[in-house]
């Protein structure tokens, strides 16, 4: 039997809970693409008792997210805690130091520490992926880093944020006012706006 690719998720707000739901719902699809089973083993968040609309019973729980990095049943840490420093940065640094791959949707962390973290990951032969936090999940970083690596980029134009895409699409489709659509986009079930888990 092929060894599964084991994931830990830190942060169970809108994005983290959706990651858990998607991995559970699309396990077979991910296994085909990864050529081995993909499973979440462990989760972590500030409030263990909060209802997130997803079943967390199958997963081990860590109150301290940095402890995810030391677990033997984790190959990759998904960091969706948020913030440029504090627990998010400590977790990513610990994960890389422990030989774990990292996926993050944390724009602030990448903006402030992305270069140093990327260098650390590359030196260790690990993957640090931040595409989930860029351009609403469009594979823009991969296209720039791999597909256009031999070209010189001088500019990139576009709406590169999922919330902006939602707002502009809703305004165009419905004719509603900006403020009304913005308020809808800020609801927790539509967009994760400043919510930290």
Regions found by a protein language model. Give the residues of each.
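Short acidic, glycine/serine/threonine-rich loops at helix termini
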Residues: 20-21, 53-56, 114-117, 139-146, ...
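Short, hinge-like loop/turn segments at secondary-structure boundaries
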Residues: 57-60, 120-123, 146-149, 174
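Conserved anion/nucleotide-ligand pocket segment
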Residues: 145-197
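Glycine- and other small-residue-rich loops at beta-strand/loop junctions that grip anionic moieties
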Residues: 12, 79-81, 106-107, 132-133, ...
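N-terminal glycine-/serine-/threonine-rich beta1-alpha1-beta2 phosphate-ribose binding loop
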Residues: 1-98
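Conserved active-site and cofactor/substrate-binding residues in soluble primary-metabolism enzymes
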Residues: 10, 14, 18, 63, ...
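Rossmann-fold NAD(P)-binding glycine/threonine-rich loop
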Residues: 83-98, 105-146
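General beta-strand structural signal in soluble alpha/beta enzymes
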Residues: 61-63, 78-79, 103-105, 128-132, ...
């Amino acid at each position: 039997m092929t060894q599964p690719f084991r994931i830990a998720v830190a942060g169970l707000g809108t994005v983290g809970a959706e990651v858990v739901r998607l991995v559970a719902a699309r396990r077979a699809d991910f296994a085909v693409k990864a050529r081995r089973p993909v499973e979440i083993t462990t989760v972590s968040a500030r409030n263990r008792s909060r209802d997130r609309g997803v079943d967390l019973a199958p997963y081990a729980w860590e109150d301290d997210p940095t402890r995810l990095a030391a677990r033997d049943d984790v190959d990759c840490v998904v960091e969706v805690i948020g913030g440029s420093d504090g627990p998010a940065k400590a977790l990513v640094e610990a994960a890389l130091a422990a030989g774990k791959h990292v996926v993050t949707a944390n724009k602030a962390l990448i903006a402030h520490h992305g270069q140093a973290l990327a260098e650390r990951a590359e030196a260790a032969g690990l993957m640090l992926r931040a595409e989930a936090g860029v351009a609403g999940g469009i594979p823009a970083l991969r296209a720039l880093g791999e597909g256009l690596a031999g070209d010189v980029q001088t500019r990139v134009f576009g709406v590169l944020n999922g919330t902006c895409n939602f707002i502009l699409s809703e305004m165009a489709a419905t004719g509603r006012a900006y403020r009304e659509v913005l308020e809808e986009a800020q609801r927790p079930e539509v967009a994760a706006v400043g919510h930290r888990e």
